[in-house]
A protein has these predicted regions:
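C-terminal cap of metal-dependent C-N hydrolases
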Residues: 185-189, 245-309
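His/Asp/Glu-enriched, well-ordered alpha-helical/loop segment
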Residues: 61-92, 143-144, 165, 169-171, ...
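Thr-Gly-centered strand-to-loop micro-motif
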Residues: 146-149, 173, 291, 297
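Flexible loop residues that form catalytic
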Residues: 13, 98, 176, 257, ...
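Active-site-proximal flexible loops/turns
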Residues: 48, 104, 127, 181, ...
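Short, solvent-exposed cationic patches
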Residues: 310-317
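Short, glycine- and charge-enriched coil/turn segments that flank and shape catalytic ligand pockets
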Residues: 59, 133-138, 185-187, 214-216, ...
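Histidine/acidic residue-rich metal-binding segments in metalloenzymes
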Residues: 1-171
Length: 317
């Protein structure tokens, strides 16, 4: 906290990273004393492991087993479990990369009890569904492995409505730049496929296209989801998240008339692929300014490493 780090991530799954209920509670109480906040990945690790063992015993090791071993109820159960712990601890909490209608219902129940619960989702949960895992081409299916996995189209519609009515506060990427070669290293065992997708470069254009241009959300809501709300929630506001005297001149210039086709050939990420290959966007990002300096111009980097460390304060939405 002395260095200005006020937000932390915890996991209820992944054996190498998850912590037990007592440790979660103790960490939340420590954060409460200092005004910090935690973002938590919520899936039921024990049942997921049992389902994985059953699939492997049956010889079911293709990417299609991935969503079947991480079904909707196991995200919802973990969210409900965490929210009861945070109720006892008396702290606000962030549910990161929420993907299901059932998990969102648990959030709404907690809010009805008076709890402060914030929600993040990602473009891939808004735009992709679990059919991507059932492709015959192993490599094509493997590139979509992430956790939570893609869900059903009905989950997508619930998430879009939640963005529009303010139930979800932020849209992030959960960006992971694993290459296709790294993804292929898990061939023959879906649990060995590195989990995560690249998404930093496409988030804004996809949210504008499928959200604003499609009439699901307004431009103002998009700006809040991508900028203002995260800045407030994680203690960077008003230095970040607002155009105002004294704030950093971090600006994105969006040209709604400059439609484009997303393709890996124009991506700067080390991943070398995009989950949205061939998708057409309504408009595109023209320029990105960082503290008043032109950093990106029509997809080309124009500035060197000019980032600075930003100490943060306790946030609030």
């Amino acid at each position: 906290f002395a260095a200005g780090i006020t937000s932390f991530k915890m996991y209820l799954t992944y054996p190498a990273m998850m912590i037990g209920d007592g440790a979660v509670y103790s960490a939340l109480k420590a954060l409460k004393k200092r005004g910090g906040i935690a973002g938590v990945h919520c899936e039921n690790a024990g049942v997921i492991d049992a389902l994985i063992a059953a699939h492997k015993a049956a010889g079911q090791t293709a990417p299609s087993s991935h969503p079947e071993c991480r079904p909707n109820p196991l995200e919802a159960e973990a969210v409900a479990h965490l929210l009861r712990i945070t109720e006892v601890a008396g702290v606000p909490i962030v549910i990161v990369h929420l993907s299901t209608k059932e998990a969102l219902l648990e959030v709404m129940r907690a809010r009805a009890r008076g709890q402060q619960v914030y929600v993040e989702t990602c473009p891939h949960y808004l735009l992709l569904d679990d059919s991507v895992y059932y492709q015959e081409d192993y490599s094509a299916a493997a590139r979509y492995i992430c956790a939570p996995p893609m869900r059903k189209k009905e989950d997508q519609e619930v998430l879009w409505k939640a963005l529009a009515n303010g139930t979800i506060q932020t849209v992030s990427t959960d960006h992971c730049s694993f290459t296709l070669q790294q993804k292929d290293a898990g061939r023959g065992d879906f649990t060995k496929i590195p989990g995560g997708l690249p998404g930093v470069e496409t988030r804004g254009e996809l949210l504008y296209t499928a959200g604003v241009a499609a009439g699901r959300i307004t431009k103002e809501q998009m700006c809040a989801l991508l900028s203002e709300n995260p800045a407030r929630l994680y203690g960077a506001y008003p230095r970040k998240g607002v155009i105002a005297p004294g704030s950093d001149a971090d600006l994105v210039v969006y040209d709604p008339a400059a439609d484009k086709t997303i393709t890996a050939g124009t991506q700067l990420s080390a991943a070398g692929y995009t989950p949205y290959e061939g998708w057409r966007t309504k408009g595109s990002i023209a320029q990105v300014y960082l503290r008043g300096t032109l950093a990106v111009d029509h997809g080309e980097m124009k500035a060197g490493p000019i980032g600075t460390y930003i100490p943060r304060h306790p946030g609030a939405l």
